[in-house]
């Protein structure tokens, strides 16, 4: 199984939120994990926010940041190039879609052109519904 990791899924795993264990299993069993640099930015920003608001201690934030840094070394990270920007600027099957979600979906589409059959790993309902319309297998199932 190959997958594109969208931020909501990765964050659920890092934060131990609902669905996080299913995400962990999907990431662990994937042959290839592709993600946008946007995924890393969003995850780190949320981790910083959870520390700043007291949801997690500094040590807990550091542990989760280290965990993310460890797994990202095994992922194929995609930059936001002109093809992704152009696709994100166009309509998606289910609108409205948020800007960052459009970037993730556009990146997943570009990833799928390089790795056919790639699944979309997301826990965000809008991203999942749109991904289904775009023909992605969704993880977790």
Task: Name these PLM-found stretches.
Residues 1, 30-33, 74-76, 115-119:
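Short active-site oxyanion
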Residues 1-41, 50-63, 136:
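Short, well-structured N-terminal submotif of metal-dependent ribonuclease cores
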Residues 2, 105-106, 110-141:
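Acidic, PIN/NYN-like endoribonuclease modules and their adjacent C-terminal/linker elements
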Residues 12, 21, 86, 128-129:
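Alpha-helical elements of the RecA-like P-loop NTPase motor core of helicases
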Residues 35, 79, 99-102, 121-122:
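Short beta-strand scaffold positions
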Residues 40, 70-95, 102-107:
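Acidic catalytic patch
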Residues 62-69, 85, 128:
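Hydrophobic core segments within long, regular secondary-structure runs in both alpha-
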């Amino acid at each position: 199984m190959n997958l594109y990791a969208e931020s909501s899924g990765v964050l659920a795993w890092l934060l131990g939120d609902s669905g996080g264990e299913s995400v962990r299993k999907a990431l662990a069993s994937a042959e290839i994990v592709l993600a946008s640099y946007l995924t890393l930015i969003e995850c780190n920003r949320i981790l910083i926010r959870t520390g700043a608001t007291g949801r997690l201690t500094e040590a807990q934030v550091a542990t989760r940041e280290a965990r993310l840094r460890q797994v990202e070394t095994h992922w194929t990270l995609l930059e936001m190039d002109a093809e992704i920007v152009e696709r994100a600027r166009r309509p998606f099957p289910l609108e409205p879609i948020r800007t960052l979600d459009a970037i993730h979906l556009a990146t997943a589409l570009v990833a799928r052109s390089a790795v056919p059959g790639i699944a979309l790993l997301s826990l965000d309902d809008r991203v999942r519904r749109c991904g289904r319309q775009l023909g992605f297998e969704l993880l977790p199932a």
